[in-house]
């Protein structure tokens, strides 16, 4: 445990290299699982972070840096949520409402990207601004798809919870009405 031993035990595999069936631990443990990256949520988060980074680079190259903060912030948030979902931090930190945070992140990103993309395309004639505006529109679409899917999942979850409460409430009412009729 901690503190580490002065002399760690020798690894029997170190002389021969790792076995064919086992992976080498280390920085690979921080990489997201392939199954998550191939899922719809993983692909959306990868697209969000990629488009945010490209938009950020386009604004860096352009002459004014008024819109530089939004793509950088959204890139960092998308990478954070990608890492959090891949490492299943939402299961470990139950106190945070992860779907609501992700939903608010996507809604605000879609709205802000839409506004700055319209401004960049309409107001500036620089090619980097035009490219940033186009990538911003693509990012708006990806963020909108993500918040639509999150909204549907949350609505389905809440609907299932309400139907479960209604059936137990209905059963309780039936039991109370049956017990009242028996006592008369």
From Swiss-Prot:
GO MF, any single term: cytokine activity
GO CC annotation: cytoplasm; cytoplasmic vesicle; cytosol; extracellular space; nuclear membrane
Region described as Disordered: spans on this chain: 1-22, 163-184
Domain MARVEL: 36-155
Transmembrane segments: 64-84, 96-116, 131-151
InterPro entries reported in the protein's UniProt record: Marvel, MARVEL-CKLF_proteins
Biased composition (Acidic residues): 1-12, 175-184
Topology relative to the membrane: Multi-pass membrane protein
Subcellular location: Membrane
A Gene Ontology biological process term: positive regulation of B cell receptor signaling pathway
Coiled-coil regions, chain positions: none
Keywords linked to the UniProt accession: Chemotaxis, Cytokine, Membrane, Transmembrane, Transmembrane helix
Assigned protein family: Belongs to the chemokine-like factor family.
Name of the protein described by the UniProt record: CKLF-like MARVEL transmembrane domain-containing protein 3
Species of provenance: Mus musculus (Mouse)
